[in-house]
Regions:
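Active-site helix/loop module of the DD-peptidase/beta-lactamase fold
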Residues: 1-32, 36, 65
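Catalytic-site signature segments of enzymes, centered on catalytic residues
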Residues: 5, 36-90
Length: 90
């Protein structure tokens, strides 16, 4: 599978560097994420509030804040951001 940065070069140097498109599609990127809809400080809530950066996709802007919690391919965690990244690719 292609590296995700091949299709979204704005992710180079982020926690998504070294992650494949397949790992994003299977939500096994290893990127730390909080999908708690009841927590206003969760990633899923904060992602929607990120200030726009001219010429940059909102998903890329938010992804730049994230860190890795596990090696890519080793842990499944549902991440709304990753569905957005896949949409950005296609």
């Amino acid at each position: 599978s292609d590296p995700v940065i091949k299709h979204l070069p704005g992710l180079a140097g982020t926690a998504y560097d070294g992650v494949t498109v397949e790992q994003v599609a299977t939500m096994t990127s290893g990127v730390k994420w909080n999908e708690d809809y009841t927590d206003p400080k969760s990633d899923v809530a904060q992602m929607l509030l990120v200030a726009p950066v001219p010429g940059e996709l909102q998903s890329i802007t938010y992804a730049k804040r994230l860190t890795r919690e596990a090696p890519a391919g080793s842990k499944w965690v549902y991440k709304t951001l990753e569905t957005n990244l896949l949409g950005d690719i296609v």
